[in-house]
Structures are given as structure tokens and as C-alpha cells.
Regions:
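Small-residue-rich helix-loop
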Residues: 112-167, 171
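Hydrophobic alpha-helical transmembrane segments
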Residues: 4-7, 32, 142-147, 195-201
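Membrane-interfacial segments
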Residues: 6, 10, 39, 105-116, ...
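Short helix-perturbing small/polar motifs within transmembrane alpha-helices
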Residues: 1-36
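Membrane-interface interhelical loops and short interface/amphipathic helices
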Residues: 32-82
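Long, positively charged, glycine-interspersed low-complexity recognition regions
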Residues: 150-225
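Selected alpha-helical membrane-embedding segments in polytopic membrane proteins
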Residues: 63, 69-117
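Transmembrane alpha-helical segments of multi-pass membrane proteins
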Residues: 16-28, 123-137, 195-198
Length: 225
């Protein structure tokens, strides 16, 4: 409903995305509260349940005690990190869901003859410059303050880094997609190249760096590219 209202009242794409994501997070938080998920996370009950299931699986496996202990420690570390990153995961999920819904709804309305504002295709995606640069500056300041003053705000910094780096990587991916569509005619080859870039850790960081560069220089408009 909020997407339909914003499109029909000619709200900007950034405003509509922000409102849609906010409502998504509010709705998700309400569902988690009503189902007791938030309480289970805060009390540690959810981790206990995961650990119990993991323990049963390891006991049924033909592993030595040393291997079971090593896998249990790895699982515990991974789950603790996953719990710390839940806010970033929820925010990114909300942005993806809202973007896809917004894009599909807007395109269908345009096909139906309505003049509405909606996001352009993915290969032309560009994050709003001011919020991105402010976020990068705040994260840099927080990292410096935490390093020199030991503020113990690592979970907040980590969530912020995951969100900002992921968004910049998406922008970098859209730039790569732009040039693949321009120079690589085969859809299969384009998909293969994109898959290779995504599965290589260096490629992911390269996408984020490309997205950050695009905040200062419009990479798609470089002469001769």
C-alpha cells in the first residue's frame, strides 16, 4: 500500500525506498515480538536450541571427540557472529524486498499506461551519494574512536560495515552488469562472469571498491568505455 501511495503521489525513489524499508522492519519486528523470537534471542534460548540440535547431529555422526569439539566450537562461533549481524541482515533483506516490489509494481503500472516514478533497471542503479558518504564518514569515525577509546561498540560497527559494503558491492555489481550487457552478447557468458566475480572474495571487495569510486566518478559515462 505504501509503495502504491508513494508512486501515485510522485514521491522520490529514495523517499519511497526509505518508507517501504522502515515499514518492512516495523512489521518484521512486530511479528518477531508476537512470536516470542525476540525474547528467545535476548534470553539465549534460541542459541541453546540450536546448540542442542547441533549436539544431537554430532553425536549421531561417526566423529572422534576431538572432531566433535572442534565442530561444536566452529558452530558456536558462527552462530554468535550470525546473531550479531541480524540487524544488518534484516535491513538488507528489507531493502531487497522493497526494491524488487517497487520495481515490479512500477513497471507493471507503466505498462498499464500510468505515469509513475519507480527505480530504473538494475544495471543503472546508483545509491544516493550524500547518505553513502555520510555513512562512510560515520563508520570511519566510529572505528577510530573505538580503536583509541575502547568504546566496545564492535557489533554496531560490524553491522554498519556489512550494510555499507554490501550496498556498495551491489552498486559495483550494477556497473559490471552495465558493461557486460554492452560488450558481452551471450547471456550465459554474462552469468558465468558475474557468478565468478561473486564467489571470489577478492571480487566482492572489488565490487564494493568500484561502487565507492562510482560515488565520486560516474564510471558508466567514462569516455571510451
Amino acid at each position: 500500500l505504501i509503495l502504491d501511495y508513494c508512486m501515485r503521489t510522485d514521491r522520490s525513489v529514495d523517499t519511497t525506498m526509505a518508507l517501504g524499508t522502515l515499514l518492512f522492519l516495523v512489521g518484521l519486528g512486530f511479528i518477531m515480538y508476537r512470536t516470542g523470537t525476540i525474547q528467545a534471542i535476548e534470553s539465549g534460548e534460541l542459541m541453546k536450541n540450536f546448540s542442542a540440535v547441533q549436539g544431537e547431529i554430532l553425536q549421531r555422526a561417526s566423529l572422534t571427540e576431538a572432531e566433535q569439539a572442534r565442530l561444536a566450537m566452529t558452530f558456536k562461533t558462527t552462530m554468535n557472529r550470525a546473531m550479531d549481524l541480524l540487524p544488518a541482515f534484516f535491513l538488507l533483506s528489507g531493502l531487497v524486498v522493497v526494491y524488487l516490489s517497487y520495481r515490479i509494481s512500477g513497471r507493471n503500472m507503466r505498462i498499464g499506461g500510468e505515469k509513475v516514478i519507480c527505480p530504473g533497471p538494475f544495471f543503472l542503479m546508483h545509491l544516493p551519494r550524500v547518505p553513502v558518504l555520510i555513512s562512510v564518514g560515520l563508520l570511519g569515525t566510529a572505528l577510530a574512536m573505538n580503536y583509541f577509546m575502547a568504546l566496545s561498540i564492535e557489533p554496531y560497527i560490524l553491522n554498519g560495515l556489512v550494510v555499507v559494503v554490501s550496498l556498495l558491492a551491489c552498486q559495483g555489481m550494477s556497473i559490471v552488469n552495465f558493461y557486460l550487457l554492452r560488450f558481452v552478447p551471450s547471456p550465459f557468458l554474462r552469468g558465468l562472469i558475474m557468478f565468478f566475480v561473486l564467489v571470489v572474495p577478492v571480487g566482492q571487495m572489488g565490487l564494493a571498491a568500484l561502487g565507492l569510486i562510482d560515488q565520486f566518478i560516474d564510471v558508466r559515462s567514462i569516455e571510451g568505455a
